Curated annotation (Swiss-Prot):
Gene: proA
One Pfam family cited in the UniProt record for this chain: Aldedh
Protein name, as recorded: Gamma-glutamyl phosphate reductase
InterPro entries in UniProt: Ald_DH/histidinol_DH, Ald_DH_C, Ald_DH_N, Aldehyde_DH_dom, G-glutamylP_reductase_CS, Glu-5-SA_DH, GPR_dom
Enzyme class, spelled out: oxidoreductase
Biological pathway: Amino-acid biosynthesis; L-proline biosynthesis; L-glutamate 5-semialdehyde from L-glutamate: step 2/2
Length: 418
């Protein structure tokens, strides 16, 4: 078979599997996910052996530490995947849930019901744990999934997919509910993006180049997990005791992820009280800081920022520092350089906090807490398939609810339209 014929066949099989999944009971879906968790533990050595092939190739290619961190299937990452599966199992199944019902004057009862989207294509880079997280959510929501990971994680993704398919087979569920595109060339993605008769939604998750490529070339609706250029605005009415813990956690806990902090905005009225000590603490933790001209006199650890630095998703221990004159300046800066992912404010002023929540456009706005909380697990959604920075049809972490759509259910008793 040619490359195109192979990928078209994957789409056809996925569509057939999606039809099978529509009639699957919640207990059957949960049984599959439970078995996946058991197999992840039982086959940990195999998974890490395959993952090491990817890590070795990555080191040889000179991948950054942040990229290698995302790629690694450590014991803790595998434990986290198992935990995520248990959380998804515990979540209520949205499929079949009726959302309200009204009685029309003609006697018709009209309601809406949650139903699966159908077939979802997931295109992602580096992080092999996405394979499990995405498949778990799609299966629980009754969707078939086609996975196309990055070439840097090919061995890891194929190993994880084999676990998923084995669990499906053991539960006597169509194994084509989960399929992986093993071809690593970009032509495979281009072909897949043209399968509008088989695929209902495409979710790209990775670097800016991948997102733009998918958006430009897809004939299928795209739900974008765009870059995370996240900021924290330190307001003039901030509680100074909260500033350092929030900023340090948001930047350093895991700098290579999309909800890590990439910039801080400090009101000029408190910059002298905040920045010298904060910059010293960040520098001691290995954080590189690039700041505006107003910030430079307050710390020797800050170097002058270039225009390219503003709005950059560093994904490493690097942070932009900007001094602003007002709330309006902070809001304008975020509008220009933010990516509509996560924006935080540190303030004790209720009015300012309320304005920030209402006026700043992001999938999550955070008051007096770390940007790292914009995460499906932290927000009670269980594992997430990504964080959407587009507003249709989901905005923010995409859990089970966001992987369904709604259809009208009309109950009558012989009514005809006049």
């Amino acid at each position: 078979m040619t490359l195109e014929e192979t990928i078209v066949e994957v789409g056809v099989r996925a569509k057939a599997a999606a039809a099978d999944l529509m009639s699957l009971a919640t207990r059957q879906k949960d049984a599959v996910l439970s078995q996946v968790g058991e197999l992840l533990v039982a086959e940990k050595a195999f998974l890490q052996e395959e993952n090491e092939k990817d890590l070795a190739a990555g080191r040889e290619k000179g991948l950054s530490d942040a990229m290698l961190d995302r790629l690694a299937l450590t014991d803790s990452v595998i434990e986290s995947m198992v935990k995520g599966l248990k959380e998804v199992i515990a979540l209520p199944d949205p499929v079949g849930r009726t959302l309200g019902s009204v009685k029309r004057p003609n006697g018709l009862s009209v309601g809406r019901m949650c139903v699966p989207l159908g077939v979802i294509a997931m295109i992602y880079e580096s992080r092999p744990n996405v394979t499990i997280d995405a498949a778990a959510l799609c299966l629980k929501a009754g969707n078939a999934i086609i996975l196309r990971g990055g070439s840097e994680a090919i061995h890891s993704n194929l190993a994880l997919a084999s676990i998923l398919r084995r669990a499906l087979e053991e539960a006597e569920v169509n194994p084509d509910s989960v399929q992986v595109i093993p071809m690593i060339d970009r032509e495979a993605i281009t072909i897949m993006l043209g399968l509008e008769d088989s695929i209902d939604l495409v979710i790209p998750r990775g670097g800016e180049g991948l997102i733009r490529f998918v958006s430009k070339n897809s004939s299928i609706p795209v739900l974008k997990h765009y870059k995370g250029v996240c900021h924290a605005y330190i307001d003039k009415d901030a509680d100074l005791a909260k500033v350092a813990p929030i900023v340090i956690n948001a930047k350093t806990q895991r700098p290579g992820v999309c909800n890590a902090l990439e910039g801080i905005l400090i009101h000029e009225d408190i910059v002298a009280d905040v920045l010298p000590g904060l910059a010293t603490e960040l520098a001691e933790l290995g954080v590189e800081m690039r700041g505006c001209s107003q910030s430079l006199p307050f710390s020797e650890h800050i170097v002058a920022a270039s225009e390219e630095d503003w709005g950059t998703e560093f994904l490493r221990l690097c942070l932009c520092v900007k001094v602003v004159r007002s709330f309006e300046d902070a809001k304008s800066y975020i509008r220009k350089y933010g990516s509509q992912h996560t924006e935080a404010i540190i303030t004790e002023n209720y009015t300012t906090a309320h304005r920030f929540v209402a006026e700043v456009d992001a999938s999550a706005v955070v008051v007096n807490a770390s940007t790292r909380f914009n995460d499906g697990g932290e927000l009670g959604l269980g594992a997430e398939i990504g964080i959407s920075t587009t507003k249709l049809h989901a905005y923010g972490p995409m859990g089970l609810e966001e992987l369904t759509t709604k259809k009208f259910v009309i109950l009558g008793d012989g009514q005809i339209r006049s």
